[in-house]
Amino acid sequence: MKKREAKRASDAHAHASEIRAVLTLLSETPKTIARIAQGLDEQQLHRQPDVDAWSAQEIVAHLRACAEVWGRSIDRMVTEDHPTIRYVSPRGWIRKTDYLQQDFRETLRKFSEQRAGLVTRLRKLPARGWTRSATFTGTTSGRDGTVLSYANRIAEHEVRHLDQLRRTLKS
């Protein structure tokens, strides 16, 4: 019995530290983008380093679209009991918006507002709230995800794009 209790305590601690790490990454991303872009003008932020590469503006517009699409999925997991959610492609979603035409700072401002709201909602969740789940359809049949797995997905995705943003603005 003591081994099982120790394992449960260890799992809860690991779960809590993963949640803290995800919340830190999610809350820091907009600030990191602002620091990376500090002192650059719109022309620099809209410049593509080469024909097939995204500009800084396109990267942030993509992150904003992902945050909106995936953030809505998280909101549904929190507010509904195990919903079935049809997968929405952020790349398809962005084509329905004017995000790619907006100036960089407006896109970053809107992304930052969305992110602040998501982080606020996530911080209010009890530990068990992070395990709320949904079944996703549309790309793979019946794939399940949790609030934590989706929040982690967003954070990991953004880390890769922050590296891309740094490379883009160095070239």
Per-region residue spans from a language model:
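Acidic/histidine-rich alpha-helical segments that form the ligand environment
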Residues: 25-30, 36, 94-131
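Short, contiguous alpha-helical
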Residues: 9-10, 46-92, 119, 130-171
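Hydrophobic packing residues in well-ordered alpha-helices of helical domains and bundles
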Residues: 19, 23-26, 56, 104-111, ...
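A glycine-rich, hydrophobic loop/mini-helix early in the fold
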Residues: 28-31, 35, 39-50
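Short coil/turn segments at secondary-structure junctions
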Residues: 10-18, 95-105, 145
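Extreme N-terminal tail/first-helix region
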Residues: 1-28
